[in-house]
Design a protein with these regions (language model features):
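Glycine-rich flexible loops
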Residues: 1-157
Length: 157
């Protein structure tokens, strides 16, 4: 049962709580935790990720939140993460990587792939002077168009 302690794995109830809050705030049914080097590097920035790449803003979200989560903390971290997931297909968890969210495992994996590309682009952007992420209006429009188009295609299947 969700929220009950698992012997030898004290973190499990906290993870269940985190997932429950995300499910409350999204229509998606798959949450995958990715702790790839790219995801961890991006999450360690500790700030929201404003997309450099168009496919990232379309698939993951125009701005992907970066939330704190401490498995020993009170419920507030999980609630914050759940709210941050609303309207997005990914959230960064500071120092822990990313949670990629989708309607099926393939969607969640696609989010992971673009998140890794975004992380690499963000690292290069720090090295190249004058590099800027996509503008706010550009990100929002791209995400909106993608969601509307993808939703219609998904409904047909």
């Amino acid at each position: 049962e969700t929220g009950k302690a698992v012997p030898g794995a004290p973190i499990a109830p906290r993870v269940a709580e985190l997932h429950a809050e995300i499910y409350k705030n999204t229509d998606d049914i798959i949450i995958r935790n990715y702790q790839t080097p790219e995801a961890i590097a991006l999450s360690k920035k500790g700030e929201p990720e404003k997309a450099y790449l168009d496919d990232f803003c379309q698939i993951a979200g125009s701005v992907v939140a970066n939330v704190n989560w401490d498995p020993t903390s009170y419920r507030t971290d999980a609630v914050e993460a759940g709210k941050a997931a609303s309207g997005r297909n990914a959230i960064l968890v500071k120092g822990h990587g990313a949670l990629c969210i989708g309607m099926n495992p393939y969607d969640a994996d696609a989010v992971k792939l673009v998140l890794e590309k975004e992380a690499i682009a963000a690292m290069y952007a720090q090295l190249v002077l004058g590099t800027k992420n996509l503008g706010t209006l550009d990100r929002v429009i791209q995400r909106l168009v993608y969601k509307m188009k993808y939703s219609k295609q998904a409904d047909k299947k």
